[in-house]
Amino acid sequence: MCFNKFTGSRGKSGSNDANAEFMARCRAVMVEGQVKFQTAELGKVNQGGGGTIAYICALYGMNVIDSGVAVLSMHAPWEIISKADLYESARAYKAFALNA
């Protein structure tokens, strides 16, 4: 499972940033469920791309974080993921559904 704490470009336009307490809760759920996870960032600063709807949900006051399977070369002719990452992502979503 890969967590992305913040997204956006051009300053704060169309961006979101998970607060420390929400990040801590997400990490705690993963630790309690013995799920392996990592954090990442979404591409280069101010380059755009990497679309997400998290910022829209954040506009309504929701705590948001982007999460998913780590992918190498997304949108390329051959995207690559690890079977272990896919398995841990499934376990992470289950842990979150049961404990959050």
Question: Where do the model's predicted regions map?
Answer:
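Active-site-adjacent substrate-binding region
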Residues: M1-W78
